[in-house]
Every structure is written in C-alpha cells, then in structure tokens.
Amino acid sequence: MKKNRWLMALAAVGIHLCIGSVYAWSVLTKPVMNEMGLSLSETTWAFSIAILFLGMSAGFLGGFVERIGPSYSGCISACFFGTGMIGTALAISWKSPFLLYLFYGCLGGIGLGTGYITPVSVLVKWFPEHRGFATGLAIMGFGFSALIAGPAMQYLTSTVGLVYNFLILGIIYFAVIVLSASYLRPPRKGEVTPTLEEVLEKQMALKKSSPHKKQSFTRKEAMHSWRWYALWWIFFTNITCGIGLLALVSPMAQEVIHMTPAEAASFVGIIGVVNGAGRIIWSTVSDWIGRGFTYIMFFAMEIFAFYRLSVTGEKLFFEIIVLLVISCYGGGFSCMPAYLSDIFGVRHLAAIHGTILTAWGIAGIAGPLVLAVMKEMTGGYELTLDLFAGMMVLAFVIATVLHLSNRKAV
C-alpha cells in the first residue's frame, strides 16, 4: 500500500512525543525527592542514567535498527519505555532507589535510544531534497513533548499521586509508540521522486568532487576520520550544557527567580515549545546557510547566554536566556543527522548517527550531575554556568575549524 510521507512524519513525531517526556523530568524532581527521601543529586541520577542508556543503546543498536526495520524497532522501544515507566511506579511505591535507576534509567533509557533513532533515517529517505528539514521534523516531537508532559505530570501528580502518574503515562506511551511505529517504513520504488540516491548524485555532480573522496562511509570508516571526533565533541558540549539546564531548570527557576512549582511546570512546557521549534527551525535554516555555519552560530550565542545567566536574577531576562540556550540545544540535535549525511553519506546514517549519540549518553551523566553536585557544594549555580560558557568557547573554535576544513575541501 502506498503511504503518505506527511503521515510518515506524523508517526515519527508520535514516537518522539512519547519518549521526549524525559525532558519534563525536572517537574518530577522535587516530588520524587519528597516521596523517596532522596537528595537532589541522588534523584538526578535517574535522569542521567536514562540519558546514558539512551546514548549507549543508540550507539550499539544503530545497525540492528537498520536491519530489522523501523516498525519492529519502534515496538521494541515501546516495550522498554513502557516497562520503564510502569516499573518506576513500583520503585516509588517501594521507595527503592535501585529500582528507580533500573526501570527509569536502564530500561527506560534503552527504550529512549531505540525509539530516538528509529524514525530519523526513514524520514531522510522520504524527504531527500530537504534532509535538514526532515531530521528536524523527526526530532521535533522529542523537544515539544515537555509542553504536554510537563503540565500533564504536574496535574497527575497533584490529583492521583506520583505512583499513578507513572503508571498511567506508561500505558499511554506504550500504546502510542506501537501505533506510530506500525506505519513506518522506507519509501518503495516510485513513491518518492527524485529519490535520495538521485539527489545525492546531483549534488555530487554540482560539486564535481566529494570533499571526502567517498560518497558513503561505513560506521567504521567514519570513526577513523578526525571529523567524526570533532562532530562528537561539539555534540557532547552542546548537550552537556543544555541538558544540565533542562534537568534542573524547574528547581533552579524556583530558587533563582522565585517561581512557584506551578509556574515552573508551565515554564517547562514553554521550554518544550522552544526545544521543539528550535529543532525544526534551525534544521530548516541549516538547509540554506549550511550545517557548519549553523553550529558556529549556536556556540557564539551560547557563550554569551551562559555567561549572562550566571550573573542575572531578573525574571524576564532569565527566561529569555534559558529559552535561547534551549533553542540552540534543540537545533544541535536536529542538524546533526543532516551534517553527518553531508560528510559521510546516508547509506549508513542510522549506524553513524548512533555512534555520535554516545555523546548524548555521556553528556546526560556529566551535565545534570555537575550542576547538581556543584549546587550542593557551593549553594549556587554561578560557577557551573561559567564553566559551561568556557566549554562553549572551545566548541566554537572546533566548529569553526571543521567548517573551514569542509569548505576548503570542496
């Protein structure tokens, strides 16, 4: 049966709307601390382990996802993520940190990783002439999810309790992911004109020679290139700083600018809008100005943003700066698959993208825990935010060198 590529995009967004609820974790931070008697850093470990397993499972299962196809891998994601959410309800009921880390962190994280990479390479093949737009479309739902999940979690927690919040959402997420995954598949002959292969051949002809001498790299070949390591580092930096802010933005807003818990939950929802919008807007912009220059812009803006965030206590300015950082954070995710396809080709994109996502796993540990531990040690966030600004300076330099290298090679 012939399928519609816009419905394919809707199915991709459906999967990411579910698994992207991890970005609303900061709404649950204080309720989990109070319910289980944990410290801020102990609670943050659940989120960090989930992101670690997201990155590791995406890195090691990228080739597996390519082999079995998006429908089957989507169902695997549903099983792991749904089980993780329902098991988290049990962990909270029993007040067991070990079970919290096991279900939300390990099992939920594997569901996140498989679900995250499942639709990306599929949509690139359905939108071959607009690969940046396609990856932004696929990943957009992951960012937008907090808009729905943040207020929903706050409402469910206040009405039916923290345990039933995880139980109800786990069942809903399982059903939506399975339904969405059942529609996904690559385009068949004649369904997309021009095909991805034809688009790439045309682009190669216009360039007259590939900057990297090969049109398509395998995962192993890509990882032997210095460009892979440069991309990994700028991806790691953007995520470390952005995800550290995301994981703790609700308690941070309550402490720094004195938001109420309800206001902080609403702000998390707004962050979800900006996170999602940044993914689709920046990836589309990157189709016009190039992926390399887009990353240079990200880091230039974030150097300013993190420095100013460390010294401001004014509510409106705080909100604007956080939203700017989150916009760049989301855009960094959506531009990366297209940047990889520009440099390494698309034949093994899912596998290569998976290896880059290991940076997300490590950053998921580094960002939130550095921010949480230094907050407990110093009583504030200023030193960590200054550190993040410094990391952005290094990433800016690396992104510039990579961009200039790619331009000279054409």
Please tell me what each predicted stretch does.
Residues 25-30, 220-282, 337, 367:
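Extracytoplasmic gate region of multi-pass secondary transporters
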Residues 32, 113-127, 134-135, 331-344:
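Intracellular juxtamembrane helix-capping segments at the cytosolic ends
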Residues 32-33, 64-65, 148-160, 165, ...:
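Interfacial helix-cap and linker-helix signal at transmembrane-aqueous boundaries
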Residues 57-70, 279-290, 375:
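Helix-to-loop junctions at the C-terminal end of transmembrane segments
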Residues 79-93, 301-313:
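C-terminal ends and interior cores of transmembrane alpha-helices
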Residues 97-113, 317-331:
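Hydrophobic core of transmembrane alpha-helices in multi-pass small-molecule transporters
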Residues 142-189:
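Helix-loop-helix hairpin linking two adjacent transmembrane segments in secondary transporters
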Residues 231, 241, 263-339:
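C-terminal transmembrane helical hairpin of 12-TM major facilitator-type secondary transporters
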